[in-house]
């Protein structure tokens, strides 16, 4: 099922999705397989798999996404970026994605390894909108029409490289006008930021689903590193709570999980079409969050939590 079909079918219940990343080691890959059993037991609608820069974990991205869909029976999506890829290489990757039975892609410009400045690849692309256009031209040429669901990223607090919110929103509209079906936002810790962003996207004429992305805080060190990379702000009250937990990761984790539950509840109450959780390749905290959300009556979630999947083969 393509991305957009989930949100058309899910009007009576929120669409729940997870994001994982491909481990760099064989041991990490083995651990992820175990974690996937637990994540699949929560029955997300789909799982996305991030894309390693410069070939670091690109093959594993496709391997994991194919495993999730073809062996675990859950829809999955590969991330695809412009980093280090020529147009011919993108075509080759798109063919491999298609041949693996995958039909959804998260199209991003991507960040270079090491946090350096982005350099446009030779015969490649600089912007996410160019990548979306390339995907649409590829599928028209290869398959005669739209074949993939395509999601792109949105920034409630503005992309760090944009000159301001107006330019950033114009860039997002360009990605949607070029062919994106879905917008998944960067993480945020104040729901007012998301609601304002959603309002601005609608005013700009963006009609595709705009889905909030939530990342549970699991330690003070983790969130400092991630927010420094993506530009997300930490509200003063949350900062004060985390400052009290600098030497206690368990306490910081409690703060993070409680905040994520509170955010998710409000988002669902306000009628968002779904929530995309950045799960950090762990399952215990996500299970706790899912069990705390008001999903049971609307979506039959009581039959999903911990139920597992008898068809799992890992």
Indicate where each model-derived feature is located.
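Active-site pocket-lining/capping segments in soluble small-molecule metabolic enzymes
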Residues: 3, 123-144, 151-161, 205-257, ...
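Catalytic cores of alpha/beta
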Residues: 85-98, 167-171, 196-199, 219-225, ...
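Conserved beta-strand positions in the central sheet of alpha/beta enzyme cores
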Residues: 17, 48, 106-107, 184, ...
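Active-site-adjacent beta->alpha loops and helix N-cap segments on the catalytic face
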Residues: 3-7, 27-29, 55-67, 86-92, ...
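Active-site mouth loops of central-metabolism enzymes
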Residues: 15-31, 76-88, 149-167, 243-258
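Active-site beta-loop-alpha junctions enriched in small/polar residues
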Residues: 20-23, 50-54, 79-85, 110-111, ...
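Conserved N-terminal beta1-alpha1 strand-loop-helix module at the mouth
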Residues: 1-49
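Conserved, mostly hydrophobic/aromatic
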Residues: 19, 47, 97, 175, ...
């Amino acid at each position: 099922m393509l991305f957009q079909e989930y949100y058309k079918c899910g009007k009576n219940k929120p669409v729940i999705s997870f994001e994982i990343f491909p481990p760099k080691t064989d041991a990490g890959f083995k651990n992820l397989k175990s974690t996937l059993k637990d994540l699949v037991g929560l029955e997300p609608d789909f799982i996305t798999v991030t894309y390693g820069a410069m070939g670091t974990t690109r093959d594993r991205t496709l391997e994991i996404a194919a495993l999730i869909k073809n062996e675990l029976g859950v829809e999955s999506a590969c991330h695809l970026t412009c980093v280090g890829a020529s147009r011919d290489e993108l075509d080759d990757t798109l063919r491999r994605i298609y041949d693996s039975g995958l039909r959804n892609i998260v199209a991003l410009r991507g960040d270079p390894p090491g946090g350096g400045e982005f350099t446009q690849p030779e015969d490649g692309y600089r912007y996410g909108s160019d990548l979306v256009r390339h995907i649409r031209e590829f599928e028209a040429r290869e398959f005669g029409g739209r074949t993939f669901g395509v999601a792109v990223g949105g920034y409630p607090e503005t992309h760090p490289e944009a000159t301001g919110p107006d330019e950033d929103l114009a860039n997002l509209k360009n990605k949607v006008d070029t062919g994106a079906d879905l917008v998944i936002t960067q993480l945020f810790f104040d729901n007012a930021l998301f609601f304002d962003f959603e309002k601005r996207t609608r005013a700009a004429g963006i009609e595709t689903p705009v889905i909030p992305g939530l990342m549970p805080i699991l330690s003070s060190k983790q969130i400092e590193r991630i927010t420094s990379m993506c530009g997300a702000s930490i509200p003063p009250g949350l900062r004060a709570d985390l400052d009290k937990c600098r030497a206690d990761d368990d306490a910081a984790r409690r703060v993070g999980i409680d905040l994520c539950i509170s955010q998710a509840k409000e988002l669902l109450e306000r009628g968002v079409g779904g929530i995309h959780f950045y799960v950090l390749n762990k399952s215990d905290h996500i299970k706790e969050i899912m069990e705390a959300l008001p999903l049971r009556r609307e979506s039959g979630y009581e039959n999903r939590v911990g139920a597992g999947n008898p068809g799992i083969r890992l």
